[in-house]
């Protein structure tokens, strides 16, 4: 069951039905990069069903939020956290935020490096192991990785600071290398040797492993587990088509597509949140 209030649902439905949609005007979607595969398919199915096109821009959630807050043209904003869309709502720029999907963090590990959930922390702390993350604040994936480091202190005193200092923030920043077009940037960094272990979303780790034979996915042990709540908002003055698309994302059909790409429905726990 998708977590949103009755008032929000009724308001969105009312906006969606307020006037006939102009199929010639695409819905403008800004979404977290980790949603690219899932929401591309969602948008394709929505367009086939409704005749309404979706024009998508994917990137680091924080960077997209800053762009929208500065006046960038957007209608539907889907973030890898709740805080970024909530800040737009608090500023009076958008509708109440909907929690529409959940993810969790995993460790993407280079081939031949022996790691299990039980040995992951000790392995990340080794001097000869390169640790990669995304960029905190700009990209929620980086914030979630640093939440893992904070939890590590409860397992081994002082380890959190050590991990923060050694972690290379390789993705998600304004000047981060993008990697080959159409390929996993996380798998690329691991394949190129810039990281032996990369903390990233489990959904992204699956894509990286599929593209890079031999790369491993290691689940975080319960004491380090961090889940990711994904929030969506619709910008004020958006056309009815934008609300229709937002409703489609949280519909049974939209949620089935998200689940196919590894995302969990909001009612299902994906590890303790940050």
What are these regions (language model features)?
Residues 23-72, 79-82, 86-90, 98-103, ...:
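Exported/periplasmic ABC-transporter solute-binding proteins
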């Amino acid at each position: 069951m998708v977590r949103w209030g009755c008032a929000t649902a009724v308001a969105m439905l009312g906006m969606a039905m307020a006037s006939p949609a102009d199929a010639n005007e695409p819905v403008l979607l800004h979404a977290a990069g980790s949603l690219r595969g899932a929401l591309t398919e969602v948008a394709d199915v929505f367009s086939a069903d409704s005749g309404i096109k979706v024009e998508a821009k994917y990137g680091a959630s924080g960077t997209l939020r800053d762009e929208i807050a500065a006046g960038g043209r957007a209608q539907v904003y889907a973030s890898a956290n709740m805080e970024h869309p909530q800040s737009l709502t608090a500023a009076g720029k958008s509708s109440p935020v909907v929690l529409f999907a959940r993810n969790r963090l995993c460790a993407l590990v280079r081939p031949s490096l022996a790691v299990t959930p039980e040995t992951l922390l000790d392995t990340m702390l080794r001097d000869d192991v390169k640790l990669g993350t995304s960029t905190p604040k700009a990209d929620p994936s980086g914030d979630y990785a640093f939440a893992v480091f904070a939890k590590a202190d409860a397992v081994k005193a002082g380890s959190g600071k050590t991990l923060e200092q050694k972690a290379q923030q390789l993705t998600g920043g304004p000047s981060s290398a993008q990697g080959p077009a159409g390929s996993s940037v996380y798998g690329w960094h691991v394949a190129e040797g810039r990281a032996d272990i990369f903390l990233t979303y489990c959904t992204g780790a699956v894509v990286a492993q599929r593209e890079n034979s031999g790369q491993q996915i290691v689940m975080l042990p319960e004491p380090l587990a961090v889940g990711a709540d994904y929030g969506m908002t619709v910008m004020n003055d958006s056309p009815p088509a934008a609300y229709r698309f937002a409703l489609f994302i949280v519909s049974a059909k939209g949620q089935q597509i998200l689940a196919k790409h590894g995302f969990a429905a909001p009612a299902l726990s994906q590890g303790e949140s940050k």
